[in-house]
Amino acid sequence: MKKITSAALIALLVLATGNVLASSPLSKETQQNKSITQVDAFFPRVEGSFVGDPMPVYADGLFNIFYLNDVRGGSDLGVHAIHLLSSANLYHYQNQSEVIPYVNDVNDPELLLGTGSIIKVGDTWHAWYTAHNENVFPVESVMHATSKDRLHWVKHPQDTLLPGDNYRGNDFRDPHVVWVEEKKEYWMLITTRSNGRGIIARYSSTDLKNWHDRGVFFDNDTITSNANLECPTLVFFNGRWYLSFSDQWPLRLTQYRVADNPEGPWRKLDNYVVDGSGFYAGKLTIKDDRLFVFGWIPTKAGNSDNASIDWAGNLVGHELAADANGELSSLIPQELQAVIHDNPGPVHTLMPVKTLQTATQFAPLQSALYPPLPSKGELVATVNIPSSGMVMSFGLNDDNVSKATLNVVFNKSKGKVYFFNSPLETINQHNAESWIDVPLGEQVELRVLIQDSIAVFYINNKAAFSTRMYSMPEKPWSISLPQHDSFHATLKIKVMI
């Protein structure tokens, strides 16, 4: 009997059904990735790669975080295969590694994969994702794959969705598919451009194969109408519809809008973000009537605080709670809180090792210095701010607080928290790297998750603020208040082991 090679078998399969097994030769980087099966972290990534645009879906008792795997300086021409991290508690992650590969061919549309969405319908998982290749036209298109176990996928190139005449072929990506019960149909939201504006288009389907262009779903209402609205999601939560996206420029914020109906009209609330610009590409998902958002905290070139921001980094997830008006607050997920509580690591009460006066160009300050934070832990703090606010400075060299360049500023009068990557003594002459709006009263309640160079501040059970600070580990830090304020603070640190 004549043997049929695997390549010939795949070719026959394509000719017969149009389907393609989602497999390819493994690069050395992917082989290394597959050898790492477990990651225990607040903000996971698999060693040797970084987490790009996540595609979260909760099913069968697990948070399944599909994401674009970023290998820097990899041996392949292709980039951003879709990988999977899964977890029940958002701390102990199983690394399923590569599940949907790129095609390592400069002439194939799937040379570079972009984000999309995954849903489970019956016993079948469906993935829609972006194919990107500047050597072909259109540069971007939407691909479809299915799986019975979420690990082994079959691609369906015959289901490829190309940009319509009204949309820009270089920007047609990030498909998000959702079942809309009121309409008895599936909707696909797509990041694209029309008439020079960044918009979200909508397609509809009743069978997940045949899609119909329904035009502009959401027109750009951000401060720059030509910005792309990336990574959209649409969910029904707490009696309302929520649309989220991340503006590609200039703010790079994961934003949300609220509506009573899936077609809108969409309201932009006073607080319309889930985090600052230290968090990007956030996508929403539901677990048992609870809402979550997953995005990534970027690294910086050369692991330097002064360098440019990279694409991709570490995964981060917040739980979101809605008030009576639909405004969302960002919280530590309950699952992660339980892990922290049950971890046998020690809890220490923190006391200042020294207090001193700090001179700045804007006001004299009093500063309390604290010992270095653990490489992984939770800081719980209550600090009184009787007048204008406070500053938390990290990565101190000796006792020189005024020279500290990593500063989180709580501005009470403006109701804002800022992250400055500039010296405290001249901070009034610099622009903040990121910021969020959050009401600040006489007291600040903080829970800060620390992991190596990452600190995510959860403020007053209201807001999350993600930061990357490479000079923070193994160095003292401080809290500073105006010189004549009374200093009252209670701080505890839980060390994760």
PLM features: residue spans?
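Bacterial N-terminal signal peptides
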Residues: 8-16
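Secretory/extracellular carbohydrate-interaction modules
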Residues: 358-421
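Beta-rich carbohydrate-recognition and catalytic domains
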Residues: 23-174, 179-225, 236-276, 297-355, ...
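Ligand-recognition surfaces built from glycine- and aromatic
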Residues: 469-497
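Beta-strand-rich interaction surfaces with strong enrichment in secreted/lumenal proteins
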Residues: 270-271, 366-372, 433-438, 467-468
